[in-house]
């Protein structure tokens, strides 16, 4: 019997195993490798179970949890992977499987693994950074409607069909295009998720504005310098990419642009007051050099 649950892993825990290739991952679960650089995996067909492992992966992963996975540990909070949840990970990220002290039901989860070498030199390779959800935290997973789940499942199925087809000159292009289509759908569904969580998002915007004002009112900029997107994302308990995408969706500006606009507003206010010199204003707003401040205008 096999049970899969991806967990956020804290740094103080034990050894990390490097899983560099798709085949190494397949071997963990006794699954067939259809291609050295890409595979569609069906965990219900796993012939081996993994009780516990922490791993640093060398490829992209997209998992569709098609059955309840149980509790996901994130910091000190627990989250449930409900049916129809998509979780994505990028090369270099650390994830884990922990089946200790819990029953192990067979999961219906499926996934796509693809190595960066597969997409190198392709359109997808050039634009992979646009799929920012690969850098979202695990508690920022995508929750699908029934119709969306059918679409994602169909995309994964088409990749599987192409992998099972005898290799010819069209194989790589079709595989990569189908992966790109899958990711485009996930991007669309994430945007829908942002919209359906509109009120929660607006609360985050209000908190962001409050923290941004406090950053300068409390003169944090003098010691810490210019505020970063990561600073505010951490305060909101979100990953920088998820936070940035949320701000962009709600305001039409990137989080960095939003911060810069606020700095410009404050700078104009303080300069027009005539109490401080330009250099003093620049210093209090976090600029190390006044000439960098001047470039804002």
Range-by-range predicted roles:
Residues 76-90:
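Short acidic-glycine-tyrosine-enriched beta hairpin
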Residues 100-167:
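A hydrophobic/aromatic-rich effector-binding and dimerization subdomain
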Residues 166-173, 187-231, 249-254:
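Short, Lys/Arg-enriched, Trp-marked, Pro/Gly-tolerant hinge/linker segments that flank
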Residues 230, 241, 277-279, 290-291:
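Residues within helix-turn-helix
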Residues 249-288:
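Terminal helix-turn-helix DNA-binding modules in bacterial transcription factors
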């Amino acid at each position: 019997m096999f049970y899969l649950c991806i967990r956020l892993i804290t740094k103080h825990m034990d050894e990390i195993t490097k899983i560099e290739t798709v085949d190494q991952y397949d071997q963990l679960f006794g699954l067939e490798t259809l291609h050295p650089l890409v595979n569609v995996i069906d965990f219900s067909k796993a012939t081996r179970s993994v009780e516990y492992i922490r791993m640093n992966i060398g490829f992209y992963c997209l998992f569709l949890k098609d059955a309840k996975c149980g509790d996901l540990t994130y910091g000190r909070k627990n989250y449930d992977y409900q049916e129809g949840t998509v979780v994505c990970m990028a090369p270099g990220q650390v994830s884990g499987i922990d089946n200790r002290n819990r029953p192990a039901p067979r999961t219906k989860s499926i996934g796509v693994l693809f190595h960066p070498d597969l997409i190198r030199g392709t359109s997808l390779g050039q634009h992979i950074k646009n799929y920012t959800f690969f850098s979202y935290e695990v508690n920022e997973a995508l929750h699908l409607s029934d119709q969306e789940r059918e679409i994602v499942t169909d995309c994964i199925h088409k990749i599987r069909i192409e992998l099972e087809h005898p290799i010819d000159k069209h194989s790589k292009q079709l595989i990569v295009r189908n992966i790109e289509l899958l990711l485009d759908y996930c991007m669309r569904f994430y945007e829908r998720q942002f919209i359906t969580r509109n009120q929660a998002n607006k609360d985050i915007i209000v908190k962001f504005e409050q923290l941004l004002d406090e950053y300068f009112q409390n003169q944090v900029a003098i010691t810490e310098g210019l505020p970063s997107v990561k600073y505010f994302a951490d305060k909101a308990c979100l990953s920088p990419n998820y936070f940035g995408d949320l701000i962009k969706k709600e305001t039409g500006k990137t989080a960095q642009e939003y911060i810069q606009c606020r700095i410009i507003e404050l700078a104009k206010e303080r300069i027009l007051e005539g109490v401080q010199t330009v250099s003093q204003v620049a210093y209090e707003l976090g600029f190390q050099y006044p000439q960098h401040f001047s470039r804002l205008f």
